[in-house]
Amino acid sequence: MSDRIDRDVINALIAGHFADPFSVLGMHKTTAGLEVRALLPDATDVWVIEPKTGRKLAKLECLDSRGFFSGVIPRRKNFFRYQLAVVWHGQQNLIDDPYRFGPLIQEMDAWLLSEGTHLRPYETLGAHADTMDGVTGTRFSVWAPNARRVSVVGQFNYWDGRRHPMRLRKESGIWELFIPGAHNGQLYKYEMIDANGNLRLKSDPYAFEAQMRPETASLICGLPEKVVQTEERKKANQFDAPISIYEVHLGSWRRHTDNNFWLSYRELADQLVPYAKWMGFTHLELLPINEHPFDGSWGYQPTGLYAPTRRFGTRDDFRYFIDAAHAAGLNVILDWVPGHFPTDDFALAEFDGTNLYEHSDPREGYHQDWNTLIYNYGRREVSNFLVGNALYWIERFGIDALRVDAVASMIYRDYSRKEGEWIPNEFGGRENLEAIEFLRNTNRILGEQVSGAVTMAEESTDFPGVSRPQDMGGLGFWYKWNLGWMHDTLDYMKLDPIYRQYHHDKLTFGMLYNYTENFVLPLSHDEVVHGKKSILDRMPGDAWQKFANLRAYYGWMWAFPGKKLLFMGNEFAQGREWNHDASLDWHLLEGGDNWHHGVQRLVRDLNLTYRHHKAMHELDFDPYGFEWLVVDDKERSVLIFVRRDKEGNEIIVASNFTPVPRHDYRFGINQPGKWREILNTDSIHYHGSNAGNGGTVHSDEIASHGRQHSLSLTLPPLATIWLVREAE
């Protein structure tokens, strides 16, 4: 019998260096009958069993004391279902042979994966509990075309790479194996001999759950059921909808006071969700929740792109959180990081011993700012991995929007690089053509497959058409963060009011390009870290003036065209920078009514008023929705404009960015009549000085600013007021 199997083959198989285990193991036809071969380290006796009757058909001979067995079942010509009775340490176990099952991946799936056009690669790759030929187990598939051998190791096989070597599908570079008995909740990894002969242990790129750091194994976990998208959630993302986003880092929004430990997904569902709803926000934006090894990356260096982090609970717990947000009327935005990944050796880096997911040349594949690796978007399987991930979060978790991080670093080859540190594209330019095509393709597929879900770009340059359709030469995003507006307005607000007259254009310049993109106005986490100070602490003056400046700024921001985004803590004017290792300073809201309560009430009222009046959001991206009334009064740092809805209804917004009240300030208006003050950031309700206009004011038929009718208002110090025209 030993003549049938070459000794070198047995040695290679046992040593874990044999790349084609199915050519040796399992059931094979021979002239003497059907031969069954098995590699079962530490076994002492093995029989082939008839499953229905339990009858022993043949005892396998031990050809190698390290666990290689073989035996012939005479007079049998056709393959049949069998089991193995194996004696380990004196105990008999009945097992199904993984090597009796045929190929797992269908030819069409293999072709689509190789072409990079499989819309949902996660349905094929990764670990999936399944039943094959009446046997329950898990099918594993991993793309590692340059590996010499790949095995599944885990809790079901003592983490022994000899026991379950996989089949290579050469046409696609995918290794596959069905392991009977492996089930949900068990840990696993892929052990491989890489292209260079080195032994590697890798987490599954397509794992749906993973261990919490510092452990790095993947978990067998069923594919989540699809989430049905509702019409209400679709409408909440549209261009004419009120969108006010509360940006949250789940690990530091609030912590347990006794041990500074995180809240769980379910605790966040019970605390964060009702708070955001009460505050009037329409959307929750989550900093990346993909599994990541380093807390200090805030999730922006993910190693488990398909796995919600276990820091706050299980995959099902995260689904519970999303469901709770939807039940409260909140859409959920997920920060998504397809731009780079960390160098940790258990993850994607040099996955099969080659630069499989990343570029081989560090001038293309290494991000020196973050010590991370850059995806090779030109490789079809890599692009497919990422596009499929976008669909996965939207379809399987009900994520309503993806905010794509660091788009500029993706689309420019020379991003943060000096001359000689980057490689031009094929036309000699600086654009990363493959990344641009990847983004366009992702946005196109999402638009086709999940109507109503949207994408938002954090893009820090003036790359044209980020939020324009692909057929117009754009990238196809629905929205783009307006970082220029954010920088200009914060630069203005930090100035002593006496100097603001010399920088008046920082508040007006944004309208010159406002309709080139569909903008979100962001005051994000990036603006309250790394020595930039908190938003409150950037405001000039004493404590009263700091809070007044902040309130005036928020009133301006909520009225300015564009959707709104505010990072957690800013809604109650946290005074210190954000610390990801600690809770927000909720104690500032303790001990009686104070300035922080005032800002919190203002943000709530801004949200509710903004949502109630269509003029404040319906035409954000249409020039008809905005008109300057006073734009050139730089000496007094006064700016006045109107917001307008589709029916022509107007809201007047007036800001005074000096501490000097402006009494009897007259300006021309479009619509005469009685105007009611609906919001005043200087109200005593917000701990202001309570200057204002007594509720209502009537227009005069006095020409001003080129208009026949005008209003005469009191403009409170360091304040913004909103007025709506009363019906006759």
UniProtKB/Swiss-Prot annotation:
Example GO BP: glycogen biosynthetic process
UniProt keywords, alphabetically: Carbohydrate metabolism, Glycogen biosynthesis, Glycogen metabolism, Glycosyltransferase, Transferase
Molecular function via GO: 1,4-alpha-glucan branching enzyme activity; cation binding; hydrolase activity, hydrolyzing O-glycosyl compounds
Biological or metabolic pathway of the protein: Glycan biosynthesis; glycogen biosynthesis
EC number: 2.4.1.18
Active site location: D405, E458
Gene3D superfamilies (UniProt xref): Glycosidases, Golgi alpha-mannosidase II, Immunoglobulins
Pfam families found in the cross-reference section: Alpha-amylase, Alpha-amylase_C, CBM_48, GlgB_N
Catalysed reactions listed for this entry: Transfers a segment of a (1->4)-alpha-D-glucan chain to a primary hydroxy group in a similar glucan chain
Top-rank lineage group of the source organism: Bacteria
Cellular compartments per GO CC: cytosol
Assembly and interaction partners: Monomer.
Task of the protein: Catalyzes the formation of the alpha-1,6-glucosidic linkages in glycogen by scission of a 1,4-alpha-linked oligosaccharide from growing alpha-1,4-glucan chains and the subsequent attachment of the oligosaccharide to the alpha-1,6 position.
Family (UniProt): Belongs to the glycosyl hydrolase 13 family. GlgB subfamily.
Name of this protein: 1,4-alpha-glucan branching enzyme GlgB
Source organism of the structure: Shigella flexneri
